[in-house]
Amino acid sequence: MKASRFFIGTLKEAPADAEIVSHKLMVRAGMIRRVAGGIYNYLPIGLRSIRKVEAIVREEMNRAGALELLMPAVQPAELWQESGRWEQYGPELLRFKDRKDNDFVIGPTHEEVITDIARNQIKSYRQMPVNFYQIQTKFRDEIRPRFGVMRGREFLMKDAYSFDKDAAGLNESYRKMYDAYVRIFTRLGLEFRAVAADSGSIGGNFSHEFHVIADTGEDAIAYCPTSEFAANIEAAEALPLIAERAAPAQAMEKVATPGKAKCEAVAELLAIPLERTIKSIVLATDNEGAEPTIWLVMLRGDHDLNEIKVSKLPGLKNHRFATEQEIVEWFGTPPGYLGPVGTKKPVKVIADRTVANMSDFVVGANEVDYHIAGVNWGRDLPEPDVADVRNVKKGDPSPDGKGVIDICRGIEVGHVFQLGTKYSEAMGATFLDESGKPQPMLMGCYGVGVTRILGAAIEQNFDDKGIIWPESIAPFELVLCPMGYDRSEMVREAADKLYAELTAAGVDVILDDRGERPGVMFADWELIGVPHRLVIGERGLKDGKVEYQGRRDAEATLLPADAAAATVTEKIRAALAH
C-alpha cells in the first residue's frame, strides 16, 4: 500500500465529547468518525485493524471446530416472546414495526434465532455436538452511550452457540471455546485474564469473562498474584475474615452518637476500629396482596454489599431497596441508625460470613443519634442466617487458599456461558436421544466484542504520541518513511526496492510517498501506532544505512540498507510468534 493512494485522516485535536484515551486516539488517528450517539463510521485505517481481529477470531473458531453461518440483524418479535425476553430485556432492545404492523427487533444477541435454527434442523443426538458462530453487527440501545467503541450502541461481535446432548458434551464444548478464547487473546497480543463471572441477562449456570487489563476498565477484577484464581468482583467468593467467634467481653450498652449516621463517623466518635461497626442495609421483597417482606442485611462497616450475591439467596431474587417509609414503619427510625435490636416489626436478618463471627460489635439503636455497643450473637441477638453477601477487598484471603486477593481493573472483551436448557426448553428445541425419547438440547453461548477489542487494546497500549499497536492487529506492520521521496531519485529507488522486498516477504507495509515533511510524517505514523518504521534518507544511503525504530523504542538504530528488509521481517515474525 502506498500512502498517496490511501486515506489518512489524522487530527491534531480530539473531539470535546471524547472522555477516554482510546476514544480520543481512534478519532485523531482517523479510525472512526461519529454518525450518532454510540454509532460510528469505521474509516479505512480502522477497518484494517477490525479485519485483522476478525481473521484471528475466525481462524481460532474454525480450529476449535465451530461452523460459520450468518443470521439476520433484524429478528421477529415472536422468537423473543417465546423465550420470554421480549418482556425481560427492557429499553436496550430496539423494537420497531414493519409496514404490515409486525413487531421486530434489531438483535443485541442471537440466542433466539440460533435456537430456532437448531429446533428446525437438529432432530437426533447423532447430529450433535455442533457449534455455530457468526461475526455480525449488533445493536443495544444504551441509555448513555459513551467512551467511543467501548460502550457504543452499534457494534461488531462474534457470537457462537453450541448444542450438546448431555452435560458431559456441554462441558467439553465449553472447554474448547474457553481454550480458543485463550488462544485468541494471546494472539491479539493483549494482557488479559479469564475470570469467573455472573451470567447476567443472558442467563445460564456457569460463565467466564475475558478481560483486557487496563486502568480505565469499568469492571473490578479480584485475582491472586500467586495463583490462578481470578473472578469478577461480582462473583468472587468472600471468605470469613474471622475464623472463630470470640466470647463476649462487653455488656450491651446504648451510646449517644449525635449526628453520626455513617460507620466511619461512629467509629471515630467511639474511638474504635471501623471493623467493629456494622453496616445495616434494608431490602424488601414484594408479596402480592400483602405487605412486603423486610430483610436486614448486616455487613462489617468497611465492607460493601454485593447485590448479585444477594439476588441468588432464597427469597431475594427480585429484591429491592426498602423505601424510607418502609424503613420507618419497620424500624421506627430513618436510615443511619438502623440495627437488628428491638425492631418495631419482625424482619429477616442475614449476616455476612465475617459479621456472623464478630463479637462485641456496634449496631444502630433504631433511634436517631444513638447506637448500641457490645452486641453479641446468641446473648443479645438470635443466631442469624449466614451468607456471603459482600464484595471482596484487596488483602482478603484468596478462595483457593493460595495467597491474598488483589484488585485490578479490566475491560470485558469476551464472555463464555453454559446456558443449559434455558432457551431450548422455552422454545421447544428438542432431539431424540439413544432410546428415542425427546430431550432438550444443552446450549453454550460464546461472545467476543470485535470492535470493543480495538478500544481495549489502545487503553493498554499507548503513550503521549499515540497508539502502540500489537503487531497482530496493527493497521500496518511497518511504515517506510522516505525523506524527499518526490525529490531524490536515490531515496525513491531505495524506498521502492525495500517496499518490493518487504511486500514479497509478506509484510503488511505502507510506503509514505506523500512528500510530507519528516515531522508531519513521523507524527502521523506515531499517532496511528504502526509498530515498526524504516526511515530512508540520502545521508544514510551514502553510507549504505537506513534507520529503524520500533514504536516502543526510545532510540533509532542504523541497519545495512541491503539487509534491512530481512532484519525487520524477522522482527515482525518474532513478535507475531510471541
UniProtKB/Swiss-Prot annotation:
InterPro entries noted in UniProt: aa-tRNA-synt_IIb, aa-tRNA-synth_II, aa-tRNA-synth_II/BPL/LPL, Anticodon-bd, Anticodon-bd_dom_sf, Pro-tRNA-ligase_IIa, Pro-tRNA-synth_IIa_bac-type, Pro-tRNA-Synthase_IIa_type1
Keyword terms: Aminoacyl-tRNA synthetase, ATP-binding, Cytoplasm, Ligase, Nucleotide-binding, Protein biosynthesis
Compartments in which it is found: Cytoplasm
An example Gene Ontology molecular-function term: ATP binding
Catalytic activity: tRNA(Pro) + L-proline + ATP = L-prolyl-tRNA(Pro) + AMP + diphosphate
Pfam family, one: HGTP_anticodon
Signal peptide: none
Enzyme class, first EC level, given as a word: ligase
Predominant place of localization: cytoplasm
GO cellular component: cytosol
Keyword Protein biosynthesis: yes
SUPFAM superfamilies membership: Class II aaRS ABD-related, Class II aaRS and biotin synthetases, YbaK/ProRS associated domain
GO annotation terms (biological process): prolyl-tRNA aminoacylation
EC number: 6.1.1.15
Oligomer status and interactors: Homodimer.
Summary of the function given for this chain in its UniProt record: Catalyzes the attachment of proline to tRNA(Pro) in a two-step reaction: proline is first activated by ATP to form Pro-AMP and then transferred to the acceptor end of tRNA(Pro). As ProRS can inadvertently accommodate and process non-cognate amino acids such as alanine and cysteine, to avoid such errors it has two additional distinct editing activities against alanine. One activity is designated as 'pretransfer' editing and involves the tRNA(Pro)-independent hydrolysis of activated Ala-AMP.
PANTHER family noted in UniProt: MITOCHONDRIAL RIBOSOME PROTEIN L39/PROLYL-TRNA LIGASE FAMILY MEMBER, PROLINE--TRNA LIGASE
Family as reported in the entry's similarity comment: Belongs to the class-II aminoacyl-tRNA synthetase family. ProS type 1 subfamily.
Protein name, as recorded: Proline--tRNA ligase
Natural source organism: Burkholderia vietnamiensis (strain G4 / LMG 22486)
